Amino acid sequence: MGNPRGRRTNGSIKTSKGTQRGTVSNLLSDQPLAARPKVSIVSNDDSQDSSDGGAFTTPSTTESTLKTTINGTDSTERNMSRKPSSPMAPAFMVSAPGKVIVYGEHAVVHGKAAMAAAISLRSYLLVTTLSKSQRTITMNFRDIGLDHTWNIDELPWDVFHHPSKKKFYYDLVTSLDPELVAAIQPHADAVSPDKPEDVRKIHRRSASAFLYLFLSLGSSQNPGAIYTLRSTIPIGAGLGSSASVCVCLSAALLLQIRTLAGPHPDQPPDEAEVQIERINRWAFVGEMCTHGNPSGVDNTVSAGGKAVVFRREDYSKPPTVTPLLNFPELPLLLVDTRQSRSTAVEVAKVGKLKDEYPVVTDSILEAIDQVTLAAQQKIQEISTNGISYRTLEDLGTLIRINHGFLVSLGVSHPRLERIRELVDYADIGWTKLTGAGGGGCAITLLRPDIKEEAVRELEEKLSAEGFVKYETTLGGDGIGVLWPAVLRNGTDEEGGEEIDQQKFENAVGTEGIERLVGVGVQEKREGWKFWKRSPRFS
């Protein structure tokens, strides 16, 4: 199977100061790292389709241009090129947030509206290109113990690129092709042979999503690469961890085949929206590999950030998405029950209830829809001066009502109810389950006038009963890119600090990851750029 690991020596990519890097896509300056200015990208949106056998090669001088901005002044645009013998592409990183469904879970699967908001817990994907002789791809998802390498030349390219099967980066894919799924199955089944079956099941789903996207968007001439993922999002807790990963994979692969432009400060709003939607569509394909029949809300909010009201009545058509760009940043108490559950199982539970009691279940789903729409109206009325206490109370009341309907659908859990009981007793906010239920997490919208002592007492009780608390914020950025994977934490003379792959893999916990890559609330470093929705699309 070739190089069994496909890894680079010492797991890092080092470039001495003053050495020019190879240029890949429209995202690199050809200046030395130490003197690299802030960069904005100008690119033609239809640069290349993914059927090109050389999809991962650098664009020619006629295919891309780069506009740099130094101290606020645009420099002359210049074409980029590199010789075939130029160095390998530098490592880059993408990051996408988790989400909470604030209103409308389960109803959204049945064509109703849901409101979801990005949270400050995120996934990070480091992409390291290997030498030409290393014909392997490695998927290293450290936080779930998945680390597997495939030989690129042994993958089923003939099936994925058959004229009757081939999909292009701009296509809308609303269902998985059974023949393509069957073609990757042996390769997905090969992962983690020594792991317990419950772990292998998770690993196989992750591998299936990765391979389906890789084979759909790439080509047999792809260079070898290592895809290293770390996440601060609790897994299996209803926080969109799998969608966050799929958004990262989608963005990374689309960047590698040069079909994304930007992000940059002066990117036209319609172009940014096209880029977000392109990432989102392929992330949804990955989600189908993972969940079977996902609603699409998780990947939509992870790709675009902030908050959205989402409705998908016809799965053969794109969903209706209304961004809520004035969604206020609200501190949230997020509590993990530590009770694992399956989204597919909980969705099937509601489906069965609907089959047995269609009129009653439809009434509950319609009521949840009305809760979501009422909350949307409240948020759209928020002024630039911030949210009023009355509006916050209204949103809290709707959270409480929504939770009651979810209990009626049978998707709560005793540990979720215990969290709600403890929070209600402390009287610090309004609580509901978020996501599929059956375990996972509860969210509490906090009152603005709570006493610190009450919060501390609640935290002690939650900890004593085995719950895990996260402090997070609603309404942050969506998909972002750090290209190259350099932290802008030095002076202009010093350049930046490259992300060492070994350090990235070994970062401990949420704080360690955030401290290293710096996107979350605790740390923010210059260098990350995010695609942002425009008010014209709200």
Swiss-Prot record:
Lineage: Eukaryota, Fungi, Dikarya, Ascomycota, Pezizomycotina
Pathway this chain belongs to: Isoprenoid biosynthesis; isopentenyl diphosphate biosynthesis via mevalonate pathway; isopentenyl diphosphate from (R)-mevalonate: step 1/3
Organism name: Aspergillus fumigatus (strain ATCC MYA-4609 / CBS 101355 / FGSC A1100 / Af293) (Neosartorya fumigata)
Highest taxon above the source species: Eukaryota
Assembly, per entry: Homodimer.
Gene Ontology CC: one annotated term: cytosol
Protein name per UniProt: Mevalonate kinase erg12
Chief location bin: cytoplasm
Gene responsible for this protein: erg12
InterPro entries: GHMP_kinase_C_dom, GHMP_kinase_C_sf, GHMP_kinase_N_dom, GHMP_knse_ATP-bd_CS, Mev_gal_kin, Ribosomal_Su5_D2-typ_SF, Ribsml_uS5_D2-typ_fold_subgr
Cofactors (names): Mg(2+)
Family indicated by similarity: Belongs to the GHMP kinase family. Mevalonate kinase subfamily.
Keyword Ribosomal protein: no
